[in-house]
Amino acid sequence: MKKSPGGNPTMQNRSKFYHRFKLPLSLLALFFLFVTACMKDEVFNDQENALPDQNVVSSDQELSSRSWHSPAMVNAWSQALEDMFTFPTNALSKGQPVTARIFAMYHLAIHDALNCITPKYARYVGVERDKDADPDAAVAQAAYDVIAVVKYPDQSMANMNALLATSLAGIPEGDAKDRGIALGHAVAAAILAQRAVDIPYIQLNYPNVPAEGDEPGEFRYIPPANYGLSGYHLMAPFIIASQDQFRTDPPYAVNSPEYTTDYNEVKTLGRAIGSLRTAEQTEIAVFWAEITNRKWNEIAQQVIASRPPQSMDAWKTARLLALMHAAIADANISSFDSKFYYYFWAPISSIRLGDTDGNDNTVGDPLWTALIPALPIGGYPGVHSEAGAAAGEVLIRFFDKDNYDLDLDCPFLPGVIRHFDTISDAVDEFTISKIYTGHNMRLATDAGEAVGYPLGDYVFENGLQ
């Protein structure tokens, strides 16, 4: 068993760190990971910008009648989605930003299905309530209906089909079950309609690609897509107020000493061939190279399992997972807003053009390639570090606790377990891993993490109350 390197922020240091987003950021940025997003055509009735439903009024008698309900069905369907996006069922071919939307919609459907029966928390969409519906039937059907539409075209529904059959078979026949199934259908349809306006923005080849830069530091096209997901920054957030609410401060100048330091770091540690990475640094790079939502769902499930059983009913569990995945989705949208706004180049461009960047202290390498191929998008800030910090903050705030014994695996590295004493430790290692993959300079990862924490805090304070 390996333990992550020391030097990660404590709770106090974490708080100081994420408030840095209000100050001038000092280092540079770049890239992010893989996507070949060919999205299935989704046809719904557009329902633009409908406000999340906030109706949580219910009688004390109604709440007490279902004061505790097992989270087993919620956890089973959350685990099923995690499995669906686990290598080899999902390798590097599924894009993180698009997948973040899938996880958020799926878990919001589960959350809303429950709260349309007994409204303990605010709902994301407005669906007519049915207090007599079976909760487990509603959860199973809502989750199934969402993933059946938003999954990637090459993903099989065989396991989801089997889980739906098993889930419904375990519920006694009768009116409550029928009502639960009908409610699940209705909630899923409302979620899908609410987010149907996203569809143009999740295409890899969105038509309005910005012009290629020609000055040092400006984004250079990366063939064949040139600039991928160039409309993603226009997608409406799930919880945060606007795409630019957590926009980062500008990156540093290309001719600055900080840029030189970060340039040389990612050039030597992030390259595919001839790297100076240690064996553990390479392990860290590969360990965190999977889909962000899958990894953080694994972490969330370990956190949930560590709680006293009676402290986590279906409603509370569903809310936690919905908030965390909504935070990850919003962090992706927020990061893409900053990427598009600053239009900063990625390491693969900055290093290959290092001899013509106006910095006498950088040496270019026209053959440089990152350890892991990355999506052709702006290099600042780091999207993974922003998403990881947002997810971590939701988990920390939800239980007001950072210290956990986390033992995480990786489908890319069978038999490898990495241990973390705190959620913050996991966030910190996730952040630095993107230097080792060759996706980001340190400023980009630091900037992403710095805004990810307050973004997660905002989601926790304002979402699904």
Residue ranges and their predicted role:
Residues 44-465:
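Acidic/polar surface patches and capping/hinge elements
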Residues 27-31:
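Sec-dependent N-terminal signal peptides
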Residues 4-5, 10-25:
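Bacterial N-terminal signal peptides that target proteins for export
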Residues 39-41:
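Bacterial signal peptide processing site
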Residues 35-37:
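C-terminal motif of bacterial Sec signal peptides marking the signal peptidase cleavage site
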